[in-house]
Each structure stands twice: as C-alpha cells, then as structure tokens.
C-alpha cells in the first residue's frame, strides 16, 4: 500500500479534492488533514473524470486479492492443461543402429515417416518386435512432405515445369491433387534458390569467408583502383562529397534490380544436369566430405554398373537360348497321329449302306457329273453361234492358202451363196441322207439339264 501511494500522489490528491469540493461550502480549495493545499480542477476536467468513472484507489480488505496457500502438487504437469499427446520419448536400452533399422523398415515397406514410426514404437513401450508386427495394421497419413520429397519436387519442377504427370513419376507415392496443393503453397513461400543451392552456399560461406569483402567492393565500384587516378574526376568527387549516401543507394538499387532479373529468369541461368541424371544432397555431401570419398563412391558405382551389365548379358543369353528353341518348331511336341488305313476313293456311286428306311434313288447321270461348283456355266438356250470342230480349225491353219481361181475346200464351203463366215457352222452327216433338224425346231425341254 505505501508503494502505491508513493507512485500516485497526484491521483490521490485529485480524488480527495473532488470529494472535498462537494462537501466544502467554498468549493474553490481547502486544507487537507496532512496540511497540504489541494487545488480543484476546472469543471471540464471533472466532467471527464465523471465520464470515466471514479478513479480513486479502493482501500480495504474486500478489495484485496485472496491468495491461496501454496500446494506443491497443483503445479505438476497434466495432459488436460496442454492438450497435446506425447508421441516419442527416447529409451536408453535401444541402440541407435537397431532404431535406425526399424525406421528404415517402417519407411520403405510400410510408408511411415520418422515421426509416425517412432510414435508406433512409443505406443508399444519401446518394443521393436511388437511395433514391427503392428506396422501393417495401420495406414499412415500420406500428406506429409519430408525434406527428400521437397528436394525431389524442386528437381522435377526445374526439369518438367508444371507437367504434374511427369512430376508424379519421380514422386509415385504422391497424388496429383497433393502435388498441385503443395505447388501452390510452395510457390507462395519459396525463395528463388533451391534447398541444395542454399546448402551449398552455406558450406561455401563456411570455407570462404572473403565473400563479404567482394560484396562490399561490388557495392562501391568507384572506390577501386589507385592506378586509375584522374585529377578532374577527383575534383568532381570532392565537389560531390556531400552525396555519398545517394551513390551507394544507386549502386544497391542496381544490384537489387539485377537480382530481381535473375529471380525472374532463374531457369535460364541454371546449369542443369543431363537428362536422366539427378543430384541429391546426400551424394554431394558424401563426395565433398573427404578427398578419397569421391574415389570410393565412384568405385562402388563402377561395381554396380558391372553387376548390372552382367545381369543384362545373362538375360541376353537366356533370350537367345529361347529363340533357338523356338526356331526348332513344335514338331516334337505334337501328338502322334493314328495310322488308320483309308478306303480308296471312287468316282462312281458308293455302295448303299444297309438301312431300314428306304433311300431315294438318284439317277446315274447326276452321279457321274462333277460337283455343282466345278460345272461349267452353260446358257439356258443353245447358242446360235457354235465353234467349228477341231478338225476344221486345224484344217484352216494347216491347208495352204488357195489361189485366186481355186475353189475353197468342201469342208468349209458354205451351203448357200452367202459370203463365208469367220466361224462357219459344222455340217452334220446323218444316216440315210436325211437333213438334220434346224436349230429353231430343237426342243430344249427334252434335253437333260446339265445344271
């Protein structure tokens, strides 16, 4: 209480004067019990105090805070106060090698991240066997982006751009929806340099601490060479000595503009590896950790390459052997055919098989004819223009050409006085000197049908 009174004597004086002004008949001022004089404020100040309420300090036991007795058990940690859940607590009996092996199995076989794998182990009270048996019973939440996933996404985006189908080939455990969602969050918060570039820059800054001096020289390019001394320039520099800050600002502005240009066209100035080659942070760190590490890694890669070549050669040998077997054919795998004697085929009618039902009799003329598909197509009515017999055709080409006064041979002599035709009709000889009937009088219905 004395401390509060020491801090605000003016406040106490104002409150007392306000209370005393209402009771005293003078209203202008009065003497207090302590003997000090208190002057009343104008009415405007009193009205402002009335608006904000009574500002006086309240004294008494009813206005003091009640502090309970000290209880050491009440300050213990409770889960209800924080609302969080403990997911991992290290245990001294588990060696680090065994723990790393458990985490690797959980990540590679079951898709857990490190936090989920350790949470499962802590749930089973650091029993690795029970945790490994219980890992397949749960599906981990796949929307977690580890550092490896982020680096792979940056590499894939630098190679393929916004082709999320190609990016998914490098991140097969991520869906296209999750890739698009991460792309927009990464686009807003990303810096123009990738994680690998930042890590390489940190390592370079640790080894080379002279980069800051180079930056200072770039920021002040006019403070460079002593050999480029020019008295006129020096006089101008002395005349403009009152503006050193502006020149430095201009230089910094140019650098910022160049950096902005580099940020907007960062893809052009990047040195990309060839297609099919990818860099990872672990490999770069492993190569740069010691001078002999690069040779050992290259030897391991050579051994892996040789083993892969051997596998390819073995596959080629197996394929060539299979091709040779295929060229031999499948004759040896065919089942043997039954050697049954076959009856000779006859063109005549086959003997009728004994049957109880009577079979219709087929004329012999139709059996001796060829099948319908092999029969020649003949016109329905006999043709008026017939070909001459073969003897007459041969005689036409064998006999010598007649002279002008020699009559034609009797075989091709026309029956009437009409000029000779190119294809004369054959002369049919009949028994008894009877003339053959004309072609018009032949009845086609009496002839058997060839069809």
From Swiss-Prot:
A GO term for molecular function:
enzyme binding
Indicate where the modification Asymmetric dimethylarginine is found in the sequence.
Answer: 401, 413
Check the record and name the InterPro entries matching this protein.
ELM2_dom (IPR000949), Homeodomain-like_sf (IPR009057), REST_helical (IPR049048), SANT/Myb (IPR001005), SANT_dom (IPR017884), Trans_reg/Corepressor (IPR051066)
A GO term from the CC aspect: nucleus
The listed locations are: Nucleus
Domain called ELM2: residue spans: 55-139
Biased composition, Basic residues: where in the chain?
261-273
Which residues belong to any copy of the SANT domain? Answer: 140-191
List residues of cross-link (Glycyl lysine isopeptide (Lys-Gly) (interchain with G-Cter in SUMO2)).
76, 249
List every stretch annotated Disordered. 1-55, 204-275, 333-451
In this chain, composition skew of type Low complexity spans 375-384
Coiled coil stretches, renumbered: 293-329
Family matches, as Gene3D superfamilies? 1.20.58.1880, 4.10.1240.50, Homeodomain-like
As for what it does, the entry says: May act as a component of a corepressor complex that represses transcription.
Q: Which family does it belong to?
A: Belongs to the CoREST family.
Instruction: Kindly provide the name given to this protein in its UniProt entry.
Output: REST corepressor 3
- Naturally occurring in which organism (per UniProt): Mus musculus (Mouse)
Name the gene: Rcor3
């Amino acid at each position: 209480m004395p401390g509060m009174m020491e801090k605000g004597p003016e406040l106490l004086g104002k409150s007392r004067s306000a209370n005393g002004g209402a009771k005293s008949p003078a209203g202008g001022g009065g003497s207090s019990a302590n003997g000090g004089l208190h002057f009343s404020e104008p009415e405007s100040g009193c009205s402002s105090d009335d608006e904000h309420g009574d500002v006086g300090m309240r004294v008494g036991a009813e206005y003091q805070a009640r502090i309970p007795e000290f209880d050491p058990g009440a300050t213990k940690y409770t889960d209800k106060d924080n609302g969080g859940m403990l997911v991992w607590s290290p245990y001294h009996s588990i060696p680090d090698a065994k723990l790393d092996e458990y985490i690797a199995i959980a990540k590679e076989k079951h898709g857990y991240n490190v936090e989920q794998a350790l949470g499962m182990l802590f749930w089973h009270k650091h029993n690795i066997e029970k945790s490994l048996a219980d890992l397949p019973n749960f599906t981990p939440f796949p929307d977690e982006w580890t550092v490896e996933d982020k680096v792979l996404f940056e590499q894939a985006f630098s190679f393929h751009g916004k082709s999320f189908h190609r990016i998914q080939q490098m991140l097969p455990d991520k869906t296209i929806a999750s890739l698009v969602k991460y792309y927009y969050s990464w686009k807003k918060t990303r810096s123009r340099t990738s994680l690998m570039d930042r890590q390489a820059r940190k390592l370079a800054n640790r080894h080379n601490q002279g980069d800051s001096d180079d930056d200072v020289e770039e920021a002040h390019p006019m403070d460079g060479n002593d050999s480029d001394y020019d008295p006129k320039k020096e006089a101008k520099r002395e005349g403009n000595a009152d503006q050193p800050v502006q020149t430095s600002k201009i230089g910094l502005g140019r650098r910022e503009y160049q950096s902005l240009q580099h940020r907007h066209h960062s893809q052009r100035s990047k040195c990309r590896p060839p297609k099919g080659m990818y860099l990872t942070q672990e490999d770069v760190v492993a190569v740069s950790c010691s001078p002999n590490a690069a040779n050992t890694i290259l030897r391991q890669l050579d051994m892996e390459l040789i083993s892969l070549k051997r596998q390819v050669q073995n596959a080629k040998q197996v394929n060539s052997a299979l091709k040779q077997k295929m060229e031999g054919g499948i004759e040896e795998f065919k089942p043997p055919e039954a050697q049954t004697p076959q009856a000779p085929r006859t063109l005549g009618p086959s003997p009728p098989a004994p049957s109880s039902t009577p079979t219709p009799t087929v004329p012999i003329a139709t059996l001796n004819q060829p099948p319908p598909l092999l029969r020649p197509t003949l016109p329905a009515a006999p043709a008026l223009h017939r070909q001459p017999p073969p003897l007459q055709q041969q005689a036409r080409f064998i006999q010598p050409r007649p002279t002008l006064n020699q009559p034609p041979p009797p075989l091709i002599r026309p029956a009437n006085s009409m000029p000779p035709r190119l294809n004369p009709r054959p002369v049919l000889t009949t028994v008894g000197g009877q003339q053959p009937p004309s072609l018009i009088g032949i009845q086609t219905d009496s002839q058997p049908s060839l069809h």
